[in-house]
Amino acid sequence: MKAKVYVTLKKSVLDPQGKAVQQALAALGFTDVKDVRMGKYIELELNAAADHSVGPKIKTMCEKLLANTVIEEYRFELV
């Protein structure tokens, strides 16, 4: 089983990396891009079979290590 975790800055937090990418895209002529938000993608390969206990474990991993919940939000999917 695999878990895909997506971590992004909260909307209320300034994203300087995203702003730099947006400006670089504009300099390259891609002026249609209104906003860019950068984040992290994490893939976890799990030994566990798909059951109801996996979701809470991934949530705990995110809250304790993978995301800084003060400034970041996360979501995950099990595949």
Predicted regions span which residues?
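Amphipathic alpha-helical segments that form the core helices of the histone-fold
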Residues: 42-47
